[in-house]
Amino acid sequence: MTVNVAVLGAGSWGTILANLLVENGHHVELWGNDPEKVAEINEQHTNKHYLPEFKIDSRLHATLDLNEAFEAVDVVLFVIPTQVIRLVAEQIAPVLEAKGVKPVIVTASKGLEQGSHKRISEVLTETIPADIRNGIVVLSGPSHAEDVAMKDITTLTAASTDLVQAQWIQEIFMNDYFRLYTNTDVIGVEMGAALKNVIALGAGALHGLGYGDNTKAALMTRGLAEISRLGVAMGANPLTFIGLSGVGDLIVTGTSVHSRNWRTGNALGEGQKLDDVLENMGMVVEGVATCKAAYELAQQRSVDMPITNAIYNVLYRGCDIRTEIGNLMQRSGKPEIDFK
């Protein structure tokens, strides 16, 4: 079965997922908005800014033209920064309607929209009418593009309220090194995917400050607890957070030098300024915007998220990291398991 896929976003993850789908035998159009990058992918079969050592399959075609990308399309895969998803979705909706296609919409982006605090699937539901899409599937889990490029074994979750569509996406992506599981808890999968980026900033900061494994383990474990609290308050199944999109994604993002969020936190821990770190990164660090959304959402829902609050204070109020750590340690005693 050959499927026509349009991948939106020619960054590291978008390029790798597009390449994987081509290798799985599907026809893929990779849409980007940078003419030089699109030309590089088509002519040199590289994307050196994001994947310096990776050779792209010559069958993968990149394009600047949404009309070309959506020709007879079966799947539209969003792999773009969270804060521009609404804008791009609003642009593609009339193109899909004009083409007369009704694809499955898949998102592999991870974050919460600033201002509205909405999950990505909620944004897509609002911007792409139901009569021009065939369901929405969330793709999430512990996955760095660099590892998938090396064909390291990787497992993700395909989540949808429509299990049949999740199973179809599962079939399209799976091969001998890339395995998907299905889940119907879209809220839990998306909340875990978004919020782990915030905790990864903290984990990186601890490393930059010179803290050891005990401290990092404490932060990640208690970070998962508050991710779960907010997720459950939003309607998620608490068991989702011990799965791939919860603890799995938190482990890989909170411990790896491949993680932009971890690297950003590490640089902050070493004493660098946030604006300088983000400028030098040259790529979107989702956890920074998501931290603000998570902080505001927790305030609205009266959910206790002390680690997220501390990271927010560092990012948005200029507070000292060590002072925030001290404040966390001076809190009154609490039960370990508490979803309130």
UniProtKB/Swiss-Prot annotation:
Its EC number is 1.1.1.94. It is found in: Cytoplasm. GO terms for molecular function: glycerol-3-phosphate dehydrogenase [NAD(P)+] activity; NAD binding. Sn-glycerol 3-phosphate binds at K110, G141, S143, K196, D249, S259, R260, N261. GO terms for cellular component: cytosol. SUPFAM superfamilies: 6-phosphogluconate dehydrogenase C-terminal domain-like, NAD(P)-binding Rossmann-fold domains. Keywords: Cytoplasm, Lipid biosynthesis, Lipid metabolism, NAD, NADP, Nucleotide-binding, Oxidoreductase, Phospholipid biosynthesis, Phospholipid metabolism. Pfam families: NAD_Gly3P_dh_C, NAD_Gly3P_dh_N. Pathway: Membrane lipid metabolism; glycerophospholipid metabolism. Disulfide bonds: none annotated. Gene3D superfamilies: N-(1-d-carboxylethyl)-l-norvaline Dehydrogenase, domain 2, NAD(P)-binding Rossmann-like Domain. It catalyses: sn-glycerol 3-phosphate + NAD(+) = dihydroxyacetone phosphate + NADH + H(+); sn-glycerol 3-phosphate + NADP(+) = dihydroxyacetone phosphate + NADPH + H(+). The active site is at K196 (proton acceptor). NADPH binds at S12, W13, K110, A145, R260, V284, E286. PROSITE patterns: NAD_G3PDH. One of its GO terms (biological process) is glycerol-3-phosphate biosynthetic process. Catalyzes the reduction of the glycolytic intermediate dihydroxyacetone phosphate (DHAP) to sn-glycerol 3-phosphate (G3P), the key precursor for phospholipid synthesis. HAMAP family: NAD_Glyc3P_dehydrog. Belongs to the NAD-dependent glycerol-3-phosphate dehydrogenase family. This is Glycerol-3-phosphate dehydrogenase [NAD(P)+]. It comes from Latilactobacillus sakei subsp. sakei (strain 23K) (Lactobacillus sakei subsp. sakei). The lineage of its organism: Bacteria, Bacillati, Bacillota, Bacilli, Lactobacillales.
